[in-house]
Amino acid sequence: MSKQEAVSELTKQQAQAELTPLREQLKKWGAEYYEQDNPSVEDYVYDRAYQRLVEIEQRFPDLVVPDSPTQRVGGAAESQLNKVTHEIPMLSMGDVFSLAELADFNRRQQDNSDVKVDFDYNLELKIDGLSLSLVYENGRLVQGSTRGNGTIGEDVTENVKTIKSIPQVLPEPLSLEFRGECYMPKEAFVKLNERREAEGQPVFANPRNAAAGSLRQLDPKVTAARQLDTFMYYVPDYQALGVTTQAQALEKMRALGFAVNPNYRVVHSQAELTAYIEEYTKKRDQLPYGIDGIVEKVNDLATQVALGNTVKVPRWEIAYKFPPEEQATVVRDIEWTVGRTGNVTPTAVMDPVQLAGTTVSRASLHNPDYLVEKDIRLGDTVLLHKAGDIIPEISRVIIEKRPADSKPYEVPTTCPECGADLVHLDDEVALRCVNPMCPAQIKEGLAHFASRNAMNIDGLGPKIIEQLWDKGMVKDVADLYRLEAAQLLTLPKFGEKSISNLLTAIANSRHNSCERLLFGLGIRHVGAKVAQLLAAEFKSVDALMAADAATISAVDSIGPIIGDAVATYFQNEQVHQLIAELKEVGVNMDYLAPTTSATESAEWAGKRVVLTGKLTKMTRGQAQEWLSARGASVTGSVSKKTDLLIAGEKAGSKLEKAQTLGIEVWDEDRFDQAMKEEN
């Protein structure tokens, strides 16, 4: 933002001229954040602009209009999800950006209020997620909803039932609403983006966007796979809990089975308040979840009620927002890389700087539109921060330091690897190379084909694939099975033992069950789990190739998006040719039930099994691997086709549905005993 006149210096005419574009800009940013889960600016940019709007309207109250962002909460609930009306509005929160502003807020609250306010505040970490309401009747979860515009939110009941930290049934028959924050842990966010990138899908900008997009899914199975978590922090009807302070309310919620952030603290002085903020300003990078500030609440709940709310925010709480940690550096180059699906992504290469505990020299520029909107040029000095405390990102260009001979960066129109024209597909912001013979895509595809979850060819990594490609030894995955020892001897640092091990690994991969092949082919939207489901259902690649989109979509846990993608892939004549070549070199095309004894096969082969709840004697992954190895198909949802549900601790809606459908249910002890008997 260019240098602006101080609000105190504005004339009414100047204020009026500034207000309209400022409000429109804030509405646009608000819609991106609340409705599209895809903000184009960082929180602090929005916060500063919003703060200026507040100050102008406070100075000229007659210029306030009903649709100003200061008069509304959040954004509209604009999705295909059902709408929920909040009986008690879910308000926004006021914020301050310095310790001085926070001290001033407290002083005004204590001195100017008709209500006596003691220096008795509960401090809580401000979790970077989205607000969530949970309604219980007689102790049972009956509704989950997002904040939306504060009055009307979205019904996400079935989705919240998939979140492990949310109890389905309370230990007391309470009929109450509980509020909190839904978030995505940092580790889950990184893994989700790695998965999406591997499958050619756009990655999320930060954990908050990922959490919002995951919670607002139409399909609860998608939400379940995203590893969301929650921290609850508020009960509108606190008297029903028998508590008198915010700290007591948090402990009561913990006793009821909710996840409550343990890092809250009651403070009684400005020194204690400052110490807490300074402590978590330093610790925030080490936390397994994102925080973007500290929330200060009047600890006494009766005082909270007496203070009440403005039209938009409570008077009894305020958020202290962390200043963004930024470092200035210089952009030296912009590299363009081609992914397995042809997506061409720009990356800024910069002078190394220390940022949030790590050395950073590269930052993704996401897509060409982002690069153009930010007007990033070679030689520019830029401010760098970590989005969601994780991903290095350029905040802005420091225009004053731009070289005099600077020129706008020209986005390439041809693929940096093969020279083919780059295109936008289906209104995507990404640029794609659609040349099926693009070397970069083929090499990425070869690496994916050989990866552990695909054909599992040990020893065949990207560097060796690069050498094989450069020597002209492979042009597609079928060529891997035509490699001979004499060819490999020409590669540097390749001895007889290495060659023998690699050829053995390649030969062994011929005999994989076909779900590994399906995943290895790199079909859009087909991860390892989907490949397993398709293989178990159709039994062979040929049968899957012959199926239409509707038939594939009807498979349990698949759906129309995946069904269309798979059917479209197998309609391609080049794919038919590749499958024929793979058959020619002896690659198995059938689903192979694991080699087991007659007793084992009778017990597990072909069974559809669902795992639910927390397992204590093994991880869910270990249980799934054991079952799959014995021919069982492990699915994510309960249906009439399910043969067995294995229920761990705190099993919820899946257990209820299985019991309703009359499906056999085992607890973990029985499953553990069955494993011991077979092993």
Curated annotation (Swiss-Prot):
The keyword Coiled coil does not apply. DNA ligase that catalyzes the formation of phosphodiester linkages between 5'-phosphoryl and 3'-hydroxyl groups in double-stranded DNA using NAD as a coenzyme and as the energy source for the reaction. It is essential for DNA replication and repair of damaged DNA. HAMAP family: DNA_ligase_A. Belongs to the NAD-dependent DNA ligase family. LigA subfamily. SMART domains: BRCT (SM00292), LIGANc (SM00532). GO terms for cellular component: cytosol. This is DNA ligase. The active site is at K126 (n6-amp-lysine intermediate). It comes from Limosilactobacillus fermentum (strain NBRC 3956 / LMG 18251) (Lactobacillus fermentum). InterPro entries: BRCT_dom, BRCT_dom_sf, DisA/LigA_HHH, DNA_ligase, DNA_ligase_AS, DNA_ligase_CS, DNAligase_adenylation, DNAligase_N. Residues 599-679 form the BRCT domain. The keyword Ribosomal protein does not apply. Zn(2+) binds at C415, C418, C433, C438. SUPFAM superfamilies: BRCT domain, DNA ligase/mRNA capping enzyme, catalytic domain, Nucleic acid-binding proteins, RuvA domain 2-like. The gene is ligA. GO terms for molecular function: DNA ligase (NAD+) activity; metal ion binding. GO terms for biological process: DNA repair; DNA replication. Its cofactor is Mg(2+); Mn(2+). NAD(+) binds at D43, Y44, V45, Y46, D47, S92, M93, E124, R147, E181, K297, K321. It catalyses: NAD(+) + (deoxyribonucleotide)n-3'-hydroxyl + 5'-phospho-(deoxyribonucleotide)m = (deoxyribonucleotide)n+m + AMP + beta-nicotinamide D-nucleotide. Its EC number is 6.5.1.2. Keywords: DNA damage, DNA repair, DNA replication, Ligase, Magnesium, Manganese, Metal-binding, NAD, Zinc.
